[in-house]
Curated annotation (Swiss-Prot):
GO biological process annotation, one example: rescue of stalled ribosome
Name of the protein this chain belongs to: Putative multi-protein-binding factor 1
Gene transcribed to yield this protein: MBF1
Residues covered by the HTH cro/C1-type domain: 86-140
InterPro entries on file: Cro/C1-type_HTH, Lambda_DNA-bd_dom_sf, MBF1_N
Keyword Transcription: yes
Organism: Yarrowia lipolytica (strain CLIB 122 / E 150)
Region (Disordered): 1-24
Domain of life from the UniProt record: Eukaryota
Length: 152
């Protein structure tokens, strides 16, 4: 009974000194992971799957087709008609490749690749070119003038 009078009851942040056991911590660097391996702690590496600002790829069907086939499939390229339409529209506006690139906020090499048919089609770049040049570059009717802007 004298033990009850001499023992201390600790309340607060230090109540679990020694008896709490190891806590689960997240190692953010490779050095922390290596230190945990050396000390013999239980180690689990998990990958975060959900992300707030991640985008899924738009090439899903194409990649599946590539996986299922044995031969080598080249990535899609811009059609020659699109390149010719860009050259024609650019010359009508009196723009150089560099000036067009500045207007669409891209590098001159990108414009050159589209005109020569080497580029992979990017919808954002094509839409910027359509707006600056005033001609259609996607779908059917490539090279025809864009219609008037819609009313809101």
């Amino acid at each position: 009974m004298s033990d009850d009078w001499e023992s201390k009851t600790v309340i607060g942040s230090r109540a679990r000194v020694g008896g709490g056991g190891p806590r689960a911590t997240v190692a953010k660097t490779q050095a922390e992971i290596n230190a945990a391996m050396r000390s013999g702690n239980v180690l689990s590496t998990d990958k975060k799957y959900a992300s707030a600002n991640s985008k899924d790829g738009g090439d899903g069907q194409r990649l599946t087709k590539i996986d299922r086939s044995d031969d080598i499939i080249a990535p899609p390229k811009v059609e020659a008609s699109v390149g010719k339409a860009i050259i024609k529209g650019r010359s009508e506006k009196g723009l150089t490749q560099k000036e067009l690139a500045v207007k669409i906020n891209e590098k001159p090499q990108v414009v050159n690749d589209y005109e020569s048919g080497r580029a992979q089609p990017n919808q954002q770049v094509l839409s910027k070119m359509e707006r600056v040049l005033g001609i259609k570059l996607r779908g059917k009717d490539i090279g025809l003038p864009l219609g008037p802007k819609g009313k809101k």
